[in-house]
Amino acid sequence: LFLSCSEDNQTPESPADADDNFITSVVMTVASQSYTAEIIDNIITITVPYTVSLNNAQVEFKYTSSATIIPDPASITDWDTERTFRVTSYNGEANDYTYKVIKDEIRYEGDVELKTTADVTAFIDTDVTVIKGDLIIGSDAEDAEELSDIAALKILKEVEGNIIIRKSYVGQDLTGLDNITSIGGLQIGTETAFATNSKLQMVSMRSLQHITGDIVVCNNQVAYVQFDNLETIDGNIIFRTSSLQSFEFPKLTTVVKDFDLQCLTSDGEPGGEITSLRIPELTKVNGRLGVNNLGKMISLEFPKLQEVGSVDFASIPIPLETLSLPELSVVNDDL
């Protein structure tokens, strides 16, 4: 007696994608806004504005239909957290993917002009962290409203253009700009038209590391200058103030153009209260190194400076006791 095998005992046919174990698409939707992940080399990267949380997002997660995945995307709510997904093919081959979230800056294209406190408040409400143009603070109009507080600008990380301080700004310092790491330049007055910000005593941006253009500060009220983390200036550094008491650039290594500091008073006499100037890490000034008319200067030190375009100490004050440039070996023009 011969019996044929039942169809129920036959081995089922493998699906066409039995060897596949891929994640092909991840899309997350928050508040009607969809974000599509980039999948490269088994890394799933989804980029969202820093203000957006992906927790409890609506998720569309596509992977090989015959495969299994752990953990199950449907069981996850905390999508802000990095994790690993394992996709196992129908035939048992595992493939791991790393899921990552990048919280990106919010950028504004163009110039930002903040003339009033209301302007500052309205700008902060946009959550912008990177300005791709100039940041203009205050106004030069005769009837301009005074602006005294820019602390709310602490969310800013970068200004690709210039930061320009105009005369209606009456703050004592630049508190609010301390989290900016890179700028195109800083302008407070010019060499031919000094700024008249009567209360501005301190110019400081504590997180600033790089300037692609110039620092120009021409204001006789400025007494304190402090840039704790600034390393490179791709343009000029120009300071004109008759009230200078301290000048701190502890990490500055390179000035691509001129380094020019003067403290002439309004009647043309040497000024400033500063007695010691030391730029400890500066190694190169491509242009002119000029320090002049600091009336009470006793010690002037550039301990690591190796190369300059030229040196201009034409108006060295009579009290000067120490002038130290021990490593200077290259002067491309005049000494």
Predicted regions and their residues:
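Concave beta-strand-loop units of leucine-rich repeat
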Residues: 107-119, 131-152, 158-335
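C-terminal motif of bacterial Sec signal peptides marking the signal peptidase cleavage site
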Residues: 2-4
